[in-house]
Amino acid sequence: MSTSKTKLSPIIAGTMNWGVWDKNLSVKEMNHLIHLCTENNITSFDHADIYGGYTTEAQFGKAFSESKIERSAIQLISKCGIQMVADNRSTTIKHYNYSKEHIIWSVENSLKNLHTDYLDVLLLHRPSPLMQADEIAEAISKLKTEGKIIDFGLSNFTSSQTELIRKNCAVQFNQIQFSATQLEPMLDGSLDYMQLHNIQPMSWNPLGTVFREDSEQTRRLKKLFAQLVTKYGVGSDTLLLAWVIRHPAQVLPVAGTVNIARIQQLMKAASLELSLEDWFAIWTESIGKNIP
């Protein structure tokens, strides 16, 4: 069980595709989407400073401000550390920066963009070979003391990298890539480690490659889902999320869809109980052979 102070929704809305990187939603459309998510009990929103080339946070913030939704009714997650080459930045090469000054500056900039006084969760976006654990801990301590972040976590960190950060700084979350087509975290000890240390996993790309690639693996899974959607009365996407949620590490899927009909169905995954054999059937079809 996570030691976090923040209670996140069982499904998290991922905003990476809301802006110019993909759907290019207007502020009005984002406003509508925020309302739609919260009306369907998806109250946690996953951001990163870099999304939309450093523009999506500000668009979301304006939409949220206009939505008139109470700040306490939602949870805002954001990430920092990746430095991208962009028109609105002086960066000359993509790199990672986890200096105390940069972490604090990034958080304060995200707060301004998101029209909020605090982040519910701050994540370090990707590990850097040059990160100094003590310096990171100082930044997080200062931000927590000032009430600018409530909880702290990581993203894409291995167990050993997490252990390094945990040395002087409590870690409540780690956002990793985990799905029915990306099985490594449940096989390499990552999810076991998080359970041992009360770190709650978030899963980005929780639908995996099922809808994005045509491969032997995805064809096997789609054939199985053709049977399971009838049995459970939900779509394949909901089944994929339910498979992720079934893991005892209490994984929180980050769903990036902006499809209205799909959003209205997503929360069914949180209450859907896949049978033991169906859960293993999905694993079996993913690897194309019986499990060991």
Language-model segments: residues:
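Short, well-ordered coil/turn segments that N-cap beta-strands
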Residues: 6-11, 41-44, 70-74, 116-120, ...
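Structural motif corresponding to the early beta-alpha repeats
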Residues: 71-98
